[in-house]
Every structure is written in C-alpha cells, then in structure tokens.
Amino acid sequence: MKQRFTSKQTSINGTKAPAVYSMKRAVNVMTGKTVVDIGGGRFDTAAEAARVYGAAVSIYDPFNRTPEHNAAVLAGSYDVAVISNVLNVIDSEAARGDVVRLAATKAAVLLIAVYEGDGSGTGRQTAADSWQENRRTADYMDEIAAALPGWNVARFGRLIQATQKR
C-alpha cells in the first residue's frame, strides 16, 4: 500500500541515534547481531551507535535512500529488524501493516518504537508531506499483532518486541 505522506521530511536528526538504539532491552537483543532498520532515514547515526555494542546495522528507507541501496539492503538477511519512529508517521493502518510485514520477512525478531507526539491519539498532518499519529506505544499493539499472526508480540514500556513463534 502506498503511503499518502512520504515522511521523507521527518528524517531530521543527523546527530543523535533514535532512542531504540539506547534502550537497554533493545541493546541486549541487538548486541553482536545483524540488524536491518526499516525506515531508518537518511542519516547513519543508528549504525554508528550500534557499532559500539557489536551490532551491524543496515538502513532501508524508500524515501531517503537510493533504490540501489535499498535493493542491496533487502537482499540481505538479518537477525533483528528495527522499526523506529516510523509507524507514527504513517496515516494508514494498512500501510503500517505493510511496513511491519516487510520487517518480518527480514528477521525473526522485531524491535518497534514510536514517537508518541502529544499522546492525544488524534493523528494530524504536520507539514505538507508529513503526518503524526500522536498515539501511545500501547495503542499500536493490536494492529502489530494483527499484522503478525503466529508471532509473540509484547510491550516493554516504550518498546514493542515481536518474535516468531517456534
């Protein structure tokens, strides 16, 4: 499903890695692993931060990376997939489900974090080509579980972890 808002302009922090890369539980899962960051933006701060704990991060972003780069990333296989601050900038549940299912094709463990905005639960357009859901992390649980039948989906504070059932 095509996204109505590309969220290209939401990749704005070139100096600080997304919070998921410093969350204790997420760091423990990623340490020493290969990681694909789905919708990771135009900057490499995530890869740089994760190198400290031995994780090798490849970033896929259809709006901020070249088609050649993205094809090479998707050709790989990974231990962990990260979706950080992505679901909250997509205005369609179907498109959010597509992102989650893409991540699930690349790794058996997903780490998902969202920016909660004002926490009102009322999504709104924030710029010409940008959207913010303003939903709390817990509010994404049902739709993530629906997108991942046969997976265990659990929330740990502001982190959602999904793992394939074995």
Question: Which residue ranges define each predicted feature?
Answer:
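Class I (Rossmann-like) S-adenosyl-L-methionine-dependent methyltransferase catalytic domain
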Residues: 1-74, 109-166
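Catalytic P-loop NTPase motifs of RecA-like helicase/translocase cores
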Residues: 66, 89-90
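A conserved beta-strand element that flanks and buttresses the S-adenosyl-L-methionine
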Residues: 82-85
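A short, conserved alpha-helix within the catalytic core of class I
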Residues: 90-102
